[in-house]
């Protein structure tokens, strides 16, 4: 099932969040937005966290490197990493075509509600248009 960008929540730092409930627990799938991928251009490396790591909101969990810059990746949610997309670092070109489905980075079992600072799609688009 294709992920609809208009239904996701977004951090100011360009990570997207898709929350699903499974067996009474809430899980957040996290990736970086198509806007971020476009701005970084020519991705060459991505560092992923380990399964089992506990993340806090705003904590750096990895980085993505392009020919232009190295950018940290920040957790938009609090919880335990339960899965990482291990195929992603070897297929970064696919992020250009599919930042929202193939481009997921990690899945986190939430330990708290989503932060109120996460934006809906309209607010995120406004932020991106203002950033140019």
From Swiss-Prot:
Q: Which domain of life is it from?
A: Bacteria
Q: Which residue numbers delimit the Lipoyl-binding domain?
A: 27-109
Q: How is the cofactor bound?
A: Binds 1 lipoyl cofactor covalently.
Keyword Membrane present in the record's keywords: the answer is: no
User: What are the protein's UniProt keywords?
Assistant: Lipoyl
Question: Cofactors per UniProt?
Answer: (R)-lipoate
A single GO BP term for this record reads: glycine decarboxylation via glycine cleavage system
The record ties this protein, via Pfam families, to: GCV_H
Q: Which Gene Ontology CC terms are recorded?
A: cytosol; glycine cleavage complex
Q: Please list the residues that carry the modification N6-lipoyllysine.
A: 68
Which InterPro entries does the entry mention? 2-oxoA_DH_lipoyl-BS, Biotin_lipoyl, GCV_H, GCV_H/Fam206, GCV_H_sub, Single_hybrid_motif
Family that this chain belongs to: Belongs to the GcvH family.
Q: How does it assemble?
A: The glycine cleavage system is composed of four proteins: P, T, L and H.
> What is this protein's function per UniProt?
The glycine cleavage system catalyzes the degradation of glycine. The H protein shuttles the methylamine group of glycine from the P protein to the T protein.
Under which name does UniProt file this protein? Glycine cleavage system H protein
User: Native species of this protein?
Assistant: Rhodopirellula baltica (strain DSM 10527 / NCIMB 13988 / SH1)
């Amino acid at each position: 099932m294709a992920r609809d960008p208009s239904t996701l929540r977004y951090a100011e730092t360009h990570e997207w969040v898709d929350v699903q409930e499974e067996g009474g627990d809430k899980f957040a799938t996290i990736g970086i937005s198509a806007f971020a991928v476009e701005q970084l251009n020519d991705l060459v490396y991505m560092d992923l966290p380990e399964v089992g790591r506990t993340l806090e909101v705003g904590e750096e969990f990895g980085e993505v490197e392009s020919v232009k810059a190295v950018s940290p990746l920040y957790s938009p949610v609090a919880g335990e990493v339960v899965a990482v997309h291990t195929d992603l670092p070897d297929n970064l070109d696919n992020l250009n075509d599919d930042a929202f489905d193939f481009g997921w980075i990690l899945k986190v079992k939430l330990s708290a509600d989503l932060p109120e600072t996460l934006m809906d799609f309209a607010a995120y688009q406004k932020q991106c248009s203002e950033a140019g």
